[in-house]
Amino acid sequence: MVELAPAHFADGNNMLMWATLMLLGGAVGKSAQLPLQTWLADAMAGPTPVSALIHAATMVTAGVYLIARTHGLFLMTPEILHLVGIIGAITLVMAGFAALVQTDIKRVLAYSTMSQIGYMFLALGVQAWDAAIFHLMTHAFFKALLFLASGSVILACHHEQNIFKMGGLRKSIPLVYACFLVGGAALSALPLVTAGFFSKDEILAGAMANGHINLMVAGLVGAFMTSLYTFRMIFIVFHGKEQIHAHAGKGITHHLPLIVLMILSTFVGALIVPPLQGVLPQTTELAHGRVMTLEITSGVVAIAGILIAAWLWLGKRTLVTSIANSAPGRLLGTW
């Protein structure tokens, strides 16, 4: 279909535009992008191993694969392709705000998934095809790790999912704490040591290289929000006063999957390059100096989010509580 389309349709053909718009609609619904995102948070009610498989690695990202596989059609309808990037940019920022006010540990990860798929849509919209699939792969590693680790937390806390009823768990479940640190660092794209940094940086570089500065800025805003809500969750769950007596998981069946995914969430996972040569078009590359500038900027943004999260939820918890109970805070939480 993709190969035959250029012989039968001219670029910008109305029928082709409607076809790609319908494909985009299916991808948006499948991958929980705005405005068809409402189902994803409720889907988190399933067991965490299921979430680790279908919400981190396979089912929810199928919309990304659909657009990447039919890229030839979208290249013939540049207006629809640009719309893909806009939807991704809006989704990644809005989902970041939503994750910042969640109290259920799995819902934080649900909105995080929505936001990260927004990055993939942004990459597709700026023709950074390889970067979209690369981030799909690295996201599968660290998000599966976070979902499995969250399941371990929930079981250790007697099926409690409210993060504000936890606290101080780093001493009772140290392996899971390490998993959250590694997975959270990868999700936040901590520079050089995590797989998420390399894939997310490729997306931002693709946006800049193709002249989509506004989408690149949205990606940087999303990166700040990501590190903020991720380490908010980690600091609330694992630091502070212990509120519940947790029972650590035992045995190789519990430890081994977490350890394997921890390793793949580091820079080791970024060494696994998907064999996409000849499958997807080449992406425009930035000059080396501009790449370095972008890497430093995105790294500073990620670290700034982590430091602010530490300042707010490790040092100024009363300030956060007062803001949350204020009229603007309640309005933001409702929104």
Regions found by a protein language model. Give the residues of each.
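Hydrophobic transmembrane alpha-helices and their helix-loop junctions in integral membrane proteins
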Residues: 1-250, 262-271
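Selective for proline/serine-rich intrinsically disordered segments
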Residues: 4, 33, 255, 272-273, ...
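Residues that form generic nucleotide/phosphate-binding pockets
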Residues: 4-7, 169, 207, 279, ...
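Generic preference for hydrophobic/aromatic residues in regular secondary structure cores
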Residues: 74, 167, 279-286, 332
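Short coil/turn segments at secondary-structure boundaries
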Residues: 197, 247, 278, 320-322
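Polyanionic (Asp/Glu-rich) segments that form extended negatively charged tracts
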Residues: 247, 270-293
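Membrane-interface and transmembrane segments of multi-pass membrane proteins
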Residues: 254-264, 283-335
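Membrane-interface helix-loop junctions at the exits of transmembrane helices
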Residues: 268-274, 311-314
